Amino acid sequence: MTSSITPLVAMQGTLEKMADKFKEALPSTMDEWKFISVAKLTLNKNPKLVQADKNSLMQTFMRAAQDGLYLDGKEAAAVQYGNSVQYIPMVEGIIKVLHNSGLIKTICAEVVYENDLFDYELGTAPKITHKPLIIGDRGKPICVYAVAVTTNEGEYYEVMN
């Protein structure tokens, strides 16, 4: 009786064999085995990823490791387009990378709804004022914004609708 190894099991084994490479790529604050465990969970949730181009899949895992992000759908995602897999950092992951850079003091992103009080000014002294409606229907989302303050007290604003 011969046992056949499925492509999913084979790829999970490949991830385990790459533990040293992941350890080298990951920030020192991250454990390579936890990274591999999350990567394997990603494959279990979306087994079609192992049918895609293996090089693009492995590049996705390695890029996530280099950025110090887990492919958990919150920090980053492995998304299949045709036969290739793309590494997509998510908002939570981007914020994590910025915090870990040591260059950002605070950062936030918020959704503004049509019944919130919202005002912003551009120019040499940009300013955002957002007072969410506490009681009642906030309405539909109308825009989002992000604010970042750097460790040298620089302030950056971005409003997107």
Can you say where each PLM-predicted feature lies in the sequence?
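Binding-interface segments
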Residues: S4-I5, A10, T14-N161
